[in-house]
Amino acid sequence: MASDEKLLRGEQTQAAIVQAAYRLFIQNGYHGTSMRQIAREANLAVASLYNHFESKEQIFIAVLERYHPIFEILPNLSRTDTSDVSEFVHRAAQFIANHLDQRQDFLNLFFIELVEFRAVHIPRLLEKNEPLLTSFIQNFVAKKSNLRPFPPFVLARAFLGMFFAYYVTRFIAGNNPTLGGEAHVLDDFVDIFLHGILLEENEA
């Protein structure tokens, strides 16, 4: 019983450290955050951090695993129920947009990993969550449609890349229609992803 209570306290302390580090990383960046600051934010002694994590980088990896939205998004995408690939892509894009609207911290976390770590941790995290990623891709390619024969992982990367381009440029465009900031622009991105930018001969 005592060992169970000790384990529970340890898990609670780890969670407090990760939560405190997350707030500081979002605010100050990785290199702008010290172990001392994390300890103070978590109401712990600095030495206590090292009882749970070997380094600040290990804490950051735990933050990614806990807070990166891709691991909240993938389970929902894999359960999207429609047999039509066009509808699936539209639904998936809208779900991601709605989810990220509630996660304004996403870009901060993403760019810390991309700029300060050169995305070194993402492959490992994707491997760790491979069943979720595989389920999403299988759901993608299993739809009855005339998909061109691209490798499934390439299709998934193209979709996620399209959406990331939309999300980042949305902050640049704002609501300016001249810069493509209209409310329906996500549908335009999805249409380009599905059909490209060239007119078919019978449309020209």
Task: Please name every model-derived segment.
Residues M1-Q12, N76, E201-A204:
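N-terminal intrinsically disordered/low-complexity leader segments
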Residues V63-A92, L133-A142:
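Amphipathic alpha-helical linker/stalk segments
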Residues Q12, A16, A20-Q58, A62:
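Helix-turn-helix
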Residues V141-D191, E200-A204:
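Hydrophobic/aromatic-rich alpha-helical bundle segments in the mid-to-C-terminal region
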Residues G10, V18, L64, V89, ...:
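Amphipathic, non-transmembrane alpha-helical scaffold segments
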